[in-house]
């Protein structure tokens, strides 16, 4: 699949994760909503589903892994920053085929697109400190 299709999958996945965080609807409902309400013709739908289901199934573990690198409790994070961090943490931990620099850069770009003015700096700082936990060999 083309990198642009993966980028679009990440973008849609962050929005879905954000929606879940605020609504607490089931991930299957969120998936269905996003797949029916968005043009997915140029989206890697399988990757979108993997990201949403992966974060949904492992968010507690991902949060625990991220917490040592945060400057405040996880429940005090901006919801979009949390969604971006969870997605990036999942990619870093589970998708070793994705180079860590790509996962971090994509997260920074998502934070720039959806977050507050300085969100991308915060996301970059957290992931830069956390990368060795998720990718000890920095592949």
From Swiss-Prot:
GO cellular component terms attached to this protein's record: cytosol
A Pfam entry, by short name: NusB
GO biological process: DNA-templated transcription termination; transcription antitermination
Alphabetic keyword roster: RNA-binding, Transcription, Transcription antitermination, Transcription regulation
GO molecular function: RNA binding
SUPFAM superfamilies: NusB-like
Keyword Transcription regulation on entry: yes
Gene3D superfamilies linked to this entry: NusB-like (1.10.940.10)
Superkingdom: Bacteria
UniProt family annotation: Belongs to the NusB family.
Known function: Involved in transcription antitermination. Required for transcription of ribosomal RNA (rRNA) genes. Binds specifically to the boxA antiterminator sequence of the ribosomal RNA (rrn) operons.
UniProt cross-references to NCBIfam families, sorted A to Z: nusB
Name of the protein in question: Transcription antitermination protein NusB
Gene name tied to this protein: nusB
């Amino acid at each position: 699949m083309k990198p642009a299709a993966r980028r679009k999958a990440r973008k849609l996945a962050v929005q879905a994760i954000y929606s879940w965080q605020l609504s607490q609807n089931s991930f299957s409902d969120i998936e269905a909503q996003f797949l029916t309400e968005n043009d997915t013709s140029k989206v890697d739908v399988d990757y979108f589903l993997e990201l949403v289901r992966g974060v949904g199934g492992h968010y507690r573990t991902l949060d625990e892994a991220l917490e040592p690198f945060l400057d405040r409790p996880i429940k005090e994070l901006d919801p979009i920053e949390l969604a971006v961090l969870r997605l990036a943490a999942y990619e870093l931990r589970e998708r070793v085929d994705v180079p860590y620099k790509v996962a971090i850069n994509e997260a920074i770009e998502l934070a720039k697109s959806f977050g507050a003015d300085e969100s991308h700096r915060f996301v970059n700082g957290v992931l830069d400190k956390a990368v060795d936990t998720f990718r000890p060999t920095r592949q």
